[in-house]
Structure formats: C-alpha cells, structure tokens
Amino acid sequence: MGKVVGIDLGTTNSVIAVMEGGKPTVIPNAEGFRTTASVVAYTKSGDKLVGQIARQAVINPENTFYSVKRFIGRKQNEISQEIRQTSYNVKTSGSSIKIECPALNKDFAPEEISAQVLRKLVEDASTYLGETVTQAVITVPAYFNDSQRQATKDAGKIAGLDVLRIINEPTAASLSYGLDKQNNETILVFDLGGGTFDVSILEVGDGVFEVLSTSGDTHLGGDDFDQQIVEWLIKDFKQSEGIDLGKDRQALQRLTEASEKAKIELSNLTQTEINLPFITATQDGPKHLEKTVTRAKFEELCSRLIDKCSIPVNNALKDAKLEASSIDEVVLVGGSTRIPAIQQMVKRLIGKDPNQSVNPDEVVAIGAAVQAGVLAGEVKDILLLDVTPLSLGVETLGGVMTKIIPRNTTIPTKKSEVFSTAVDNQPNVEIQVLQGERELTKDNKSLGTFRLDGIMPAPRGVPQIEVTFDIDANGILSVKAKEKATGKEQSITISGASTLPKDDVERMVKEAEENFDVDQKRRKNIDIRNQAESLCYQSEKQVKEFEDKIDEELKNRITNLISELRSNLEKEELDSIEANSEKLQNALMEIGKNATSAEKDTQNASNDDTVIDTDFSEAK
C-alpha cells in the first residue's frame, strides 16, 4: 500500500498531510506554503490557475471561483445566502447547481472545482514524497449532511483519488490534539472555518476517541463575518457618495478582499484602515474609499453572528448531557477562531481559556493524516468512535418524519423498524428517506425515494415492511426495505443524495484523465512564463547592482536579451521564451564571474600597496 494522505478540503484554504516516521507532517505545496488557497481561476486565454496564484478575482471576477465548498452537495433553494457573496454566477441545471465559467464558455459542478484543488494538493504531495499519491482521507464539517458527504467523495473521485474515508473535521482535530494523551479528557472542539461551523464534544485518552455529541451550522463561517464589513462599507459609501458599490462586481470583490484583510488585522490590532483608491468613477472624476475600522465596530457589526455561535455549543453540551464545567479543554480550529470576540465568547460559555497548543489552520489535516495512518496500518492502537450529526428517518402517514437513527448515534450503525400499509390491498409502498430534526417531512431534507412493489393483497396494517438503515464509517447511508411475508426486497444507497448523477461523475473522471496531459502542459507553460518574468526582473536588478564591475558588451547583451524575452512573453512565444531564458541565465552567470574577477583585481592592487617586508622567526 502506498502513502495515504490526509486532506483538509477547506472553504478558504486547504491543507494536506502525511505520516512520516510515525509522526503526522504537513506537506508544503509547490510554492513552499503549508496552506493552499481553495481557489480556481481560468484566464481569458483559458489557462487554469489553482491556489494563491488564482486569487485574481479583482481583475477577473466572473472566472475566479472561491468558497465553492459552500455549494457542494446542495440544491438551489439551500444557497440563497451564499449566492449573494460571490462575484461569479451560480445557476440551477435540473436538480444540480452549476457554476458559470465565461472564459471557457462552460458550466462546472462545484465538485469539479473542488476536484481541481484536490488535484493540485495531491500533485504537489506526490512530488514532495517522490511517489504517486492515489489514496486519501478527506475531512468534512461534522454537520455536513449525506448529500454533502457524497459530493465530497465525488470530488475526490473526479480528482483521481480513492477516498478511503470521510472524517469529520472536529474529530480529526481531536485526533491531532489527543494523539499522545494518556489520561482521559473531555474536550470541546470549536471549529469555525471560512464557510461552516461545528462543535463536537469528545472523550479522549489512551488511544480512544469517542464523539459524545456534535452540532453546528453549515451556513456560518468567516465569509459571513467579512460580509458584515462589506455591507457596512457599501451602505456608508452610498450615503456619502450616492453610489451603490454592491452593483459593481469588480468593486464588490475589492471590498470583499479588503474586508477579509481588515478582519484578520483586527485580531491583533484595535483598529485598521481600509483604503481603496479609484473604487469607482463618475463624470466628476474618480472616487476613493477610505475608512477606519475599529475592533469595537467590527464586533458590533458581527454581534449577531457571534451570538449565533453560542447556540451549537449549548446544543452539543445538552446532547452530551454535560455541564460546561465538565469540559477539560477547549480546542479551537479554523482561522476565524483567531477573532478575539469569538475566544471571549467561548471562555464565557465554558468558563476556561481555550487551549492554544494546536495550529488552527493545520490541526484538521494533521488529524486526517493520523486516520490515514490507521487505515494504512502505520498507526496502531487508535479507536475512533464518531457519530451521525443529524437524525435519519422515513416519511410516514400524514407527512410526518419518523426517526430511525437519532442524531449523535455512534457510527457505523445499523437499525431497523417495522412499518405497514396505510390502505387495504396496497400493492406497493413509496419510501422517502429524510434527514433532519423537524417533525414534518417538508421541514427536513429529502435524501432520496424508492419503491417496494409486490406486496401481497391484505387489509391495511397487516403487511410487515421492515426498513433497515445502515450508516458506514464515512457517515454515508444505505436503506433497505423488505416485505416479511414475501421476502421481496428493495434497497437504495443514498448516493442519489449527491447532486451529481453517477454518469456525470464518471464523465468528469474521464474528462479529468483525458485532460491531464493538457493541464500539465498548461501548468508547465504558466511556470515557464512566471520564471521568465522573474528572470527579467532579477537581471535588471543585478545589472544595476554590479554596473561598475561588468563590461559594456555584457551589459548590452543582457539588456537586449531582457527586451527580447519581454517581447516573447507578450507574444506568448514559448519556445523562444525557454531559449532566451537559458541565454539570459548564462549571461547572468558571467556577471558573477566578472564581478568576482573585478573584486580580486581590486584586492590584489590593495594588497600590493600595503605589503610589509619582514622575517618571522620560528616559534620555540
């Protein structure tokens, strides 16, 4: 078995880790960073960019895709809040969500965009490890429903990965935190990421990680905190200038990026400045936006969101049947937990300072790597007992949801209930599988519907139909219905809960495989161009630095090569870019030789002037 990696596929950033020498290690990406921006962009010429280099939403808002995790596994009626926060177009295609890419004149499923991020992580990890990575453990928010979990697996499959396990993010964080803990502790994991929020309570110690309860909100995250600043800035600018910046995509994206930056700075500073010159223009000329944001103002703007974060904490404590005083440690996960008001709120609720021993950006991926190590046989004596976050059941007479597996049931699990017919001589039953906590069918999420035919004619209430729910270790559900008298059976694996039909997933996998060489070539071409641009800059810098130490012929040759290379870059002449880059690198090496030679000549001349004739006697 090759290396199995652990991946935290985040809303804002993603991280990949692996077990090395018995210890979980974060793998840096090709650019040398330990986190990779969960952003994919397509340039006007159709080139694909992934990661930090793709953060170009200000100049290319409609083709830059970020926070896509907020759409994965969802339907149109579930994303009204999230759509307002993007600069790209999101639309419905049948029951699925599609993301428009004008640069390619193509629509993408959210799973395809997430697959691009996964592929970038895995390719960089393969280079780092010196072997091809094909297997992974991927984390999801604990409060992800069945559709979102299946969609995450689909994204992994499209990226060419065998996803061995889907694991909850707070549970992964607990694995990282409690790996070396011998004594039993009750910990609360508070996970506030870019787009989702989870709280899990676990018993940790001596290799056993048991989830007692989990709660959360998949519509709450750092993006929403940014949005509060954005809306405040738009309102203020409209009042002072009479212009609605919310209708200008480019301005809106600049506001979003500036708001995120301000939020981050306010974790360490009590106030910061937002300066956006030329944010818009009128017939009177350009308009600039300048605004001071204090931490107090930020907390006032976000007070509703901060209060909202307390609800899942209280729910998790209630479900675990624990008082706040029973919690030994609070582990903070996700970049948004750096917000001082969040830390203060947690301290107020639990009565103790949060544990600061783990890196909130990396702890989930490290835990996923531990679970990957368990599955690969590298890590022994670890027992992970996770739970299902939401209740599962079926629709019964009157549009009522009858729960079969209550929320916070330890998984994997299997439970059965016997139902009957509602009318005399009913030949079949339609079984609607539901997920949620409400009493009525219409208020819960429908995961899928299937029909059991061939029921023997009988008065209502006589036939016995056994419905069995089976949840695997990934938290993914399959349901079976069996008529006891005839033995007739029908089943459904709730992969239909994914917004992508199986045929679409297979097509996307095939497309990804077919385009692998093209993608690699495009990426190589982008790298060549980036290196050439950097080389031009470095060359100009060195010519200026060593101007008095190199001869005129070399200086002119380098200047001409820089001009040629810049011309090649403008015309996208890749062969010439490579050839002239090599010539320019060789010329730069000559600068080094010339400079060293000139320095030696200077030193020799200096030494000749200061030589003193003398004899040294041998030491006795």
From Swiss-Prot:
This is Chaperone protein dnaK. SUPFAM superfamilies: Actin-like ATPase domain (SSF53067), Heat shock protein 70kD (HSP70), peptide-binding domain (SSF100920). Gene3D superfamilies: 1.20.1270.10, 3.30.420.40, Actin, Chain A, domain 4, Substrate Binding Domain Of DNAk, Chain A, domain 1. The keyword Nucleotide-binding applies. NCBIfam families: PRK00290.1, PRK05183.1, prok_dnaK. Acts as a chaperone. It is found in: Plastid, Chloroplast. Pfam families: HSP70. Residues 592-620 are annotated as: Disordered. GO terms for molecular function: ATP binding; ATP-dependent protein folding chaperone; unfolded protein binding. One of its GO terms (cellular component) is chloroplast. Belongs to the heat shock protein 70 family. Keywords: ATP-binding, Chaperone, Chloroplast, Nucleotide-binding, Plastid, Stress response. InterPro entries: ATPase_NBD (IPR043129), Chaperone_DnaK (IPR012725), Heat_shock_70_CS (IPR018181), HSP70_C_sf (IPR029048), HSP70_peptide-bd_sf (IPR029047), Hsp_70_fam (IPR013126). The gene is dnaK. Residues 610-620 have a biased composition (Acidic residues). It comes from the Eukaryota.
